[in-house]
Regions:
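ATP-dependent adenylate-handling active sites, centered on carboxylate activation for C-N bond formation
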Residues: 1-133, 169-185
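Hydrophobic alpha-helical segments with strong N-terminal bias
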Residues: 2, 30, 141-149
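Short alpha-helical scaffolding segments that buttress acidic/His motifs in well-ordered protein cores
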Residues: 10-14, 156-162
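Structural motif
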Residues: 21-22, 144-157
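A short, charged helix-loop
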Residues: 131-143
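Short Ser/Thr-interspersed hydrophobic loop/turn segments at strand-loop and sheet-helix junctions
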Residues: 158-172
């Protein structure tokens, strides 16, 4: 894909998505679907396999940090706040301390949602538009109460990230090119 092709198609891609989407994979999927539609009308995609089979690196996080998680939560919270407010961005370990100063339910909203910290988001959003993601995720976490952290993460991803991003993006980019994208999961 040349830079010219990218920019020429970007507005069309946004049109076909029907709503603002900040996932750059939509662009690659559009061009891939365009090429595939020249030869076939239906394709099988592997979308959903990472969520089902634990293929994302983030799913290893709870297992990798069990020792740190033995530190009492009030101390971890204090370390997380210290890291957020006192350590400059880019400091090694800052993100780790910030993430582990929160419970899984507080920090994990679905794959790839860590663009802004809550404090950063509040700085750029209009009053009254503060992130209220936990209102969306709380019922999901309640359904998997008592399950291990990885299962909880997968469940949230399957009900938010997979449905409202990955599968939708593949379907819309395929249909934009008269291609049916089927998923086996």
């Amino acid at each position: 894909i040349s830079p010219e092709e990218y920019w020429d198609k970007l507005s069309d891609i946004q049109y076909y998505m029907d709503e603002p989407v900040a996932d750059p994979a939509a662009i690659a999927l559009y061009f891939l679907s365009e090429e595939a539609s020249k030869k076939v009308k239906v394709v099988v995609s592997g979308e959903g396999s990472d969520e089902l089979f634990g293929g994302y690196n983030i799913y290893c996080e709870p297992l990798e940090h069990t020792s740190f998680n033995k530190i009492p939560m009030p101390i971890r919270r204090a370390l997380g706040k210290f890291a957020e407010y006192c350590l400059p961005r880019g400091t090694k370990g800052r993100g780790f301390l910030m993430r582990h100063g929160k419970t899984l339910e507080e920090r994990y909203f679905a794959n790839a949602t860590n663009i802004f910290t809550e404090r950063e988001a509040n700085k750029i959003l209009k009053k009254g538009c503060e992130p209220q993601i936990q209102k969306v995720t709380k019922p999901l976490y309640e359904r998997v109460q008592g399950k291990d952290p990885v299962t909880k993460m997968q469940y949230v991803d399957m009900h938010l990230w997979l449905v409202h991003d990955i599968l939708m993006k593949g379907d819309k980019m395929g249909m934009a090119n008269s291609l049916e994208v089927r998923v086996p999961f």
